[in-house]
Amino acid sequence: MAFSFKSFFGGADDEEEEYEDSGYEQQPNQGQQQPVNSQQQNTSNQSYSGYNNQNQNRNGFAYDNGYRQQPKMSAVNSSTQSANNSAKIDSHIALFVPKVFSDAKTIVNQLLLHEAVIVNFSAIDETQSAKIVDFVAGAIYAVEGSIEKISDEIWLIAPNNYAVSGSGSAANSMGRNARF
């Protein structure tokens, strides 16, 4: 019993179709262009990268030496890499004692430079210090930072690149009877 693909796939009753020859084996008539396959095009003097640096090895095969060698990549532990990056960052904390409301701009400028500020309100009255805290709170919201009340007159203002932990945040400690 002979195995037939046509009978297996149900094509035993199908008519056979004849396909024309693609013409690669025929000699072209004069005036007609000869078909060119893609391998014949690749043996020209130009490489894909645009360099004219093709050489032939001892077997006669053409190769392109115009490529640029990529730098070697090595796997780096992400925790080591982040530790190295954090060591390179210069972190500063500015200490500031405002005397007038216009000093709030200096505090906000430090915050915009991604630097934390410790503000001592001992040299200014309560209404002015409350206005400064309100002004700075808007900037803190804009940069997604945080504000922490350290004592009645001292506040820590930090941008989002500082992690502040501990109890007694400004939002929790402020009430109707709070100074600010």
Swiss-Prot record:
Pfam families: SepF. Residues 12-23 have a biased composition (Acidic residues). It is found in: Cytoplasm. The keyword Cell division applies. This is Cell division protein SepF. Its main location: cytoplasm. Cell division protein that is part of the divisome complex and is recruited early to the Z-ring. Probably stimulates Z-ring formation, perhaps through the cross-linking of FtsZ protofilaments. Its function overlaps with FtsA. Residues 1-66 are annotated as: Disordered. Belongs to the SepF family. GO terms for biological process: division septum assembly; FtsZ-dependent cytokinesis. PANTHER family: CELL DIVISION PROTEIN SEPF. One of its GO terms (cellular component) is cytoplasm. Residues 24-57 have a biased composition (Low complexity). Keywords: Cell cycle, Cell division, Cytoplasm, Septation. Homodimer. Interacts with FtsZ.
